[in-house]
Amino acid sequence: MIKIAKEKRTFATKFKQMLMKETLKSYFGYDSFRPLQEEIIRHLLNKQDSLVLMPTGGGKSICYQLPALLSEGTAIVVSPLISLMKDQVETLQANGIAAGALNSSNDETENANLRRACIEGRLKLLYISPEKLIAEKDYLLRDMSISLFAIDEAHCISQWGHDFRPEYRRIRPIINEIGKAPLIALTATATPKVQHDIQKNLGMVDAQIFKSSFNRPNLYYEVRPKTANIDRDIIKFIRNNPEKSGIIYCLSRKKVEELAEILQANGINARAYHAGMDSATRTQNQDDFLMEKIDVIVATIAFGMGIDKPDVRYVIHYDIPKSLEGYYQETGRAGRDGGEGRCITFYTNKDLQKLEKFMQGKPVAEQEIGKQLLLETAAYAESSVCRRKTLLHYFGEEYLEDNCGNCDNCLNP
């Protein structure tokens, strides 16, 4: 009897594995899973909570999209940005998957149709902002069958994260009200402190943690002094890397527009992107960049979260980023295909003073956290230690090599 039960279990496991592989191939076009993906998917299908820490380009989305296809009901995916939802939904729909996004950019008819599709069980994945989740908790979410909850960009829940969104703190109470469904939280940037915050605020203290290495060996890190000639330096760099896709990050919208104009005046195919532009122009510029119609996008940090362009060859920071997490996530948009990725940051102490001024007027606790994050970034910029070693140490990962061979400090000690 025991032998028969064991054989049944073995058969069920093999069948599930086969089903997962077939779904991966037929819907996503991949022959095999990336590291950790299969393990995470199996864990979620067994109705267990998971916290996934995986760098940009590691294949996080499939970890909840595939289980959603193999489960009864609709997966609720909480996502912080409308552009992020739009990209994901369009990709899923192109792959023949019933997915939709409930957000403020839809008209009421679209949202009503989506609600009906969810209640009738015709949708496999519903993307929703935390604000919309709060608004729908007493209506739609009570009337539909939910397969799982996926919290994307989970670092937004932490004040120590670089994209803190207070609404993320209200997700767990809502999940508790609605009823039991497995929960998966995912992020590409989480220091040990942020990880602890995610677990505490999402009630995931006992969740299984899946963490892949944060090392991106193909990325070259360099910090250059920021001088009065910075525009000339950037133009020279771009001309030395013709027809390569690149992103340039600036802290202010004004600087984004100024620099985009300077680059255009120097014959460089560049466009601006920031949250203050009208939505049609912003979307057009983003799409032109993705479709290779332009080489360079000059942007604030509003650009990039969830942008799937594997062949970005360089990321330049015109100003020092506000945190090392932000820096890691933004530089991580280079070389996602495993090819060349140059990450160049221009640094001057004056930028720190400017950023500290921006913080004035904010609550004291927020100012203190902001200052500490800024000091860590400044220490990284001024250090003569291997950039890779410093970055990985920040994320709680040990890097044993003395020389990475792919950063300015190691190549020019």
Label the predicted regions.
Residues 1-6, 10, 14-16:
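Short, positively charged and aromatic/hydrophobic N-terminal segments
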Residues 7-8, 154, 281, 387:
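Short, intrinsically disordered low-complexity segments
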Residues 15-27, 31-35, 39-61, 69-71, ...:
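Helicase motor core with emphasis on the C-terminal RecA-like subdomain
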Residues 83:
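Conserved Rossmann-like nucleotide-cofactor binding loop
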Residues 355, 359-413:
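C-terminal accessory/connector segments of nucleic-acid motor ATPases
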